[in-house]
Structures are given as C-alpha cells and as structure tokens.
Amino acid sequence: LDQRNPEKPFKLSISFKAPHGPFDGFAREFAQRFEEALIPLGATANPKEAARQPEFLRNSLEGPRGWEMAHDHGMQSKTQKLLRDYHRLVEGLDKGIGEILAELDRRGLGGNTVVIFTSDNGHLHGEHGFFGKWLLYEESIRVPLLIADPRLPAKDRGRSSDALVLNIDLAPTMLALGGVPVPAAMQGLSLTPLLSNPSLALRSSFFCEHLYEHDVNSPVLHIVPSEGLRTKNWKYIRYIKNPGPEGEQLFDLAADPQETKNLLTDPGAAEQLDILRKEYERLRTELGPHQSWSLKPAR
C-alpha cells in the first residue's frame, strides 16, 4: 500500500496459512485461549457413522485419526487439544483480518475498498469417521465466502445467499467489481448479481473432484481419489478407482443434510440416481482424461 499509485485502483491478495497443520503453530498470545473449553464434534462424529464407511476409505489417510476421534466422541485429551489449537489458529486469523481492516480505515481506504474473504477448503474433524480435507462430504468442500462492498446501499448489506457458488467465480467477480470486462474464456461466473438479489440461482449443479493420491503404495498414506456432482438438493460421489456399489454414494441433501444415508440402492431414488449419473458422465467426458497424481507414484 505504501508503494501504490494513489491515483489508481489497487488489488491486494493476502493468503494466511492458518488454520492449517501444524495445528500448534498459533501465536503464543493465544496459548491459553479455550483452555477450559470442551469443544464438541459434529453430529456424525460417532462410531455408527464411522463403521458404515467402506473399508478402503476407513483405511486411507483420512481414516485412522477420524475413526479415533469419532469413537471417543472427541473427548480424549489429545482430541480436545487438537480442537483447541485449531480454534486458536482461527482466532489468530481473525485478529490478522481485523488489523488489515483497521489499516484500510487508517489510510482512508475502508469506505472505497471491496473486501472478499474465503478459504480453499473445509475440514473434517471426526465427522463420518474422517479427519482432513480430501473427501467430498459437505464439511470438506464447503467454505466461507464473505463479500463486503461499501458501495452497496444499506438494504443490500448483511444479506446471505444459498446459491451454488465456486472458487472459480472469484476472479470474474473481482473483475466485475472493478469494472473490468470478464473474458469469455473464464469458466466461473460473476457473483455480483447475488449482492442485490441473493435468491438468484446462478447454476443448478457443479462438478467437483479431488484427484491427489499422496502415496499410492501405502494404504494408510493413500488418499482415495473421488469425483462428484452437487446440485442444490442432491450429491453424487464416485470413488474413481473403487468400482462396484461401495464406490458410489448418493445423498438427498434436503432430507439428509448430514449425509448419513447412502441412497445408491434405494428404489425410490433410482430416477434421481440415473439423472445425476448421466450428468456426471457428460461433464466427465467434457473434462477429458483424469489427471490424478501422487507424490509417490506406483512402483
């Protein structure tokens, strides 16, 4: 900011590592925060939910730590320490963001600067019997997204939207907010219409994937690659290297937002399964060959 031309607009991108491992990497000023707190896990962090997962997932990199957390209901001291440390990292992040906003105000820029806050992934803390960010469950794929535009009229501020939006929408949104034309080649959509009309539906579905496998030679260090299709009310997941019934999942998110009942073989969901499979296959073909990769390729 000291070096910017005050006569021109600026775009500043700030990336925080937190909250990310090592989870005890928080600033020492937060070391006593949450010390007496008992932090609960999500509703699906329980033995029953963990046990229903297919073996290839339970034995993968996400499984053992999440299994342990789910089976002790998060009450073990080391689980509570991890959760407290995670919250300490988030508090440090919150403080850092506050300092940035205060600095913008100090420079007289706060009233003319759009601030966008988001994250690159969610995180499972024992939910469904997993720990990490590698699977397509809601806890893993959903992230916060806040857009604060001081130019908006008061009636359009502080509103929320349940529209399906993606990280690829951020670049078109920033261009549009800055009055720059959005190139037709960009796959994302500008989110600016949502700022005045949060109920607007920008898309009806999206394709999602996680193809990084880490170490394909080790079951306990292997991340199971997956792809899926998410609509407003349904989610279809396919574990692309695990064919057969256990390699697919179908969830009715309207009736089962916690994703506890796989409807893959439910006759009542057969029509919806067929629709989602066909749309998945269409997008899969459009994307071309899989690009899965690993730090340690198969021997």
How would you name each of these model-derived features?
Residues 121-127, 168-171, 176-249, 253, ...:
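C-terminal cap/loop subdomain of S1 sulfatases and analogous C-terminal strand-loop tails that border
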